[in-house]
Amino acid sequence: MINKIEVLAADVDMTLSAKSSPLPEITIQALKELHKRNVKIGLATGREITEAEKTKGMFWTLGFEFDFIIGMNGGMIYDRNLNKTFTMDMLSVEEMKEILTFLMPIIEENKVSVNVEGNQLHNVMNINNHLLDMSKRRNIPLIDKTGDIDGFCEKPVYKFLFRTDSKTTQLIRNKVEEHYKGKYQTIETFPGTIELMYSGFSKGRGLEMYCEWNQINLEHTIAFGDNENDNSLLLTSGWGVCLKDGNPNTKALADDITDYD
């Protein structure tokens, strides 16, 4: 068990709260108590770090803002106190087109929903209920570019998101690993959703960088998550905690599991 907590990092969606939902009151009180004790509190999310993410404390009526944010599954880091940031490179338009061309037979055959994050690009392929729900929750438009690779790839982005069934997501992952041999990684962020981005980034590496910037021993960090993209975060921290209803593989590697989901 961890004896001294200097840093807490927590996944957002389905860990701290349901997607785009308020925090439970018990979580608010716990975060406030940790803040009073000068614990550095941060978010670890797959999302791009925007002003909305930077003001999550206000949105959740905490009375303070988070000390740091690990975004884009470790591809972005924001340290509020040091006013320091790190941002990964974007996929080029040429790379985007090559990736979609390679995966298009699978996308078309299985009606895989595709969208991206970065550069405020809202182009999508194969609109389904999951994309419609995401659009409503985050108040962003969907621009249908199904089958139009050139039209879809208007400008560079950080990552692709593919939404489909588990069998097809595994097929995509196998094809990407076999063809690109480590240039890109695929990460499950939610059952039925995988993301494709450059390799070499993870939430765990993001936590390492934050601690390096602030000269904090990783042994004094605690992390919370629920899915595959949180695995590195839980393993890197001094004490990794998985949600009770989390991914079985994530639960297996955690130091502890919550009593409640």
Each model region followed by its residue ranges:
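Mg2+-dependent phosphoryl-transfer enzymes with acidic/Ser/Thr/Gly-rich catalytic loops
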Residues: 2-7, 23-24, 195-261
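Short, hydrophobic/glycine-enriched beta-strand segments
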Residues: 6-11, 42-43
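Active-site phosphate-binding/coordination module
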Residues: 25-130
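Short active-site oxyanion
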Residues: 38-42, 66-67, 159, 219-221, ...
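Short, structured coil segments at secondary-structure junctions
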Residues: 62-65, 73, 180-182, 236-237, ...
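Conserved acidic, metal-coordinating active-site core of Asp-based
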Residues: 102-224
